[in-house]
Structure formats: C-alpha cells, structure tokens
Amino acid sequence: MPATDVGRRINHLVSSLQKDRTKIIIPTPALAEVLTRAERAGADYFTKLNRSAAFRIEPFETRAAIELARMTAMAIASGDKREGLSATWNEIKFDRQIVAIAKVTKVSTIYSDDENLGKLAKVQGFNVTTIRELPLPSEDAQMTFAWDVLHEEQEADDE
C-alpha cells in the first residue's frame, strides 16, 4: 500500500530531526535518483539541499568503497551474492553503495520505500523506516483521527 500524505510526513521528519540537531545524510547515489526523478526541478532541489544546514550530501569515497567490498565479499562467501534479492545485480550494487555510505557515516536509520535497499540495510544492522511508517504531524494525526471518527459515526447512522 503506497504512503499517503507523503509531503507532510517527510516535512515532519525533517522538522523533527532538525529540532534534535540530527543531520540528514544523503548518499550521492540516492541524490542521483532524486534528481533524476525531479527532472527540471532537480537543480532547485540540489541547491536547497546543498545550502541547508539540516542536510549533508555524502559521496561514495574510499571508506565507502572498502565497506562495499567487505559487504559484497561476505555475500559472495555466503554463497549468494544477491543475498536473496530479486533485483538486478546493478541495482544491488547501487543499493549497497547507499548502505556502505550510511555505514561509514554512522547513520542509525535509513528512510526508504525501496524494499531491496531496506533488506540490505537491515542485514547490516540499520533501522529501516518506510515513508508510510513516518508519523504525520500531531495536528494532522488529530485531524485524521477526527475524520475517521466522523466517518464511522456517519456509517453507523446510515445503517
């Protein structure tokens, strides 16, 4: 089931992390995906992310390459370089780059709706949260609750 209220959920996450003074790490492979999907708005997104104190763009560099090699070697040694994933080998290598960057930058949680990325991240000990699992701001949650209650009352009246 796709997430609803995606923008509000993400904005609430960013606000919450900013209040806690937690940097939001964006691995460059993930940034490339976002910018590709954003098309014309990509340049504006990049400028905002790059200028914001809340975000830190992290490149795939030497430490991440070493971590990626370690992760891949362990998967190969286990007899399944794909670790049971149905993704293409290129997709798996791409997702492992993201996980390797997260690992060397000491990230605790990965936020993603990508099922394969989530599985790889969990194997490496990360908490994984999907957009659907992100809470709405409290006022939105209250409004949703009120709407649900009103809707249930209306259904009861109709019976």
What are these regions (language model features)?
Residues M1-I26, L35-S52, E139-E159:
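Short, well-structured N-terminal submotif of metal-dependent ribonuclease cores
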Residues I26, P59, K93, Y111-S112:
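Short beta-strand scaffold positions
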Residues P29, T88-R96:
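Short basic/aromatic active-site micro-motif
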Residues A30, A64, Q97-I98, N116-L117:
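Alpha-helix capping/helix-boundary segments
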Residues A32-R37, G118-A121:
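Short catalytic/ligand-binding loop motif for oxyanion handling, primarily in non-cytosolic enzymes
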Residues F55-T88:
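Acidic catalytic patch
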